[in-house]
Amino acid sequence: MSYFEAFMLALVQGFTEFLPISSSAHLILPSAVLGWEDQGLAFDVAVHVGTLAAVVIYFRKEVVSLLSAFFGSVFKGDRSKEAKLAWMIILATIPACIFGLLMKDIVELYLRSAWVIATTTIIFGLLLWWVDKNSSLRDDEYQAGWKKALFIGLAQAMAIIPGTSRSGATITAALYLGFTREAAARFSFLMSIPIITLAGGYLGLKLVTSGDPIHVGTLLTGIVVSFISAYICIHFFLKLISRMGMTPFVIYRLILGFGLFAFLMMQ
């Protein structure tokens, strides 16, 4: 992998990981459209490290508060709203872990195609638009009980299908349940911390046992670029949705989906 490819793929990963437009789709497309080789396990781990660092550092106050409340609930019986939210985030992570382990081979074999990406990009974009326009948008993330957390967790599990978008699915589910746009995004971002950690750890274990070559320069490029782009993305996304809602991302998904269909039909 060249430094240019590493830079571009890390930039794409960072900007799309937390937007409702599917990071996996944008990482699959370069190989499908431009003929780039697969970036490999080591690079996957690197960009996971970068995006994880971005969300943890951006929400560092919330992360510290949630961790403190979680351990307080375990050892001291803390029943604060922060402790409840921490447990709900853990609950919401479980479905994706189960689905990921059970369905990953099927997804790899049958669903990582540009046709699937184009279809899911359009369908879930329209669903996001409908929910954003028709939901009550009144609750914050601390209103998430176990039923709501499980529902959002199931939506996150569905995002194993390329083109769906993890953040898109979870934000859509949270909006449907009555969360405000900002609360839906925050809950989605906080949910990303355990799932990115687990996914990165799983890929790291595979890397250790695979014997794949490691190029330090491209890996550092991946970490740094994905971190910076993800941090910037989180900051401006939260500001944008409070003013414009989800419409810009729906429009982008529709353009991407139909554009990809047009490209595929011309091949």
From Swiss-Prot:
Q: Which UniProt keywords apply?
A: Antibiotic resistance, Cell inner membrane, Cell membrane, Cell shape, Cell wall biogenesis/degradation, Hydrolase, Membrane, Peptidoglycan synthesis, Transmembrane, Transmembrane helix
Q: Where are the transmembrane segments?
A: 1-21, 39-59, 83-103, 111-131, 144-164, 189-209, 218-238, 246-266
Give the enzyme's EC designation.
3.6.1.27
Question: Could you tell me the membrane topology recorded for this protein?
Answer: Multi-pass membrane protein
Q: Which domain of life is it from?
A: Bacteria
Q: Name one GO cellular component term.
A: plasma membrane
Q: Name one GO biological process term.
A: cell wall organization
The top EC class is: hydrolase
User: Additional comments on file?
Assistant: Bacitracin is thought to be involved in the inhibition of peptidoglycan synthesis by sequestering undecaprenyl diphosphate, thereby reducing the pool of lipid carrier available.
User: What does the UniProt record say this protein does?
Assistant: Catalyzes the dephosphorylation of undecaprenyl diphosphate (UPP). Confers resistance to bacitracin.
Q: Which family does it belong to?
A: Belongs to the UppP family.
Q: What is this protein called?
A: Undecaprenyl-diphosphatase
Q: Whose protein is this, by species?
A: Vibrio atlanticus (strain LGP32) (Vibrio splendidus (strain Mel32))
Q: Write the lineage as a comma-separated list.
A: Bacteria, Pseudomonadati, Pseudomonadota, Gammaproteobacteria, Vibrionales
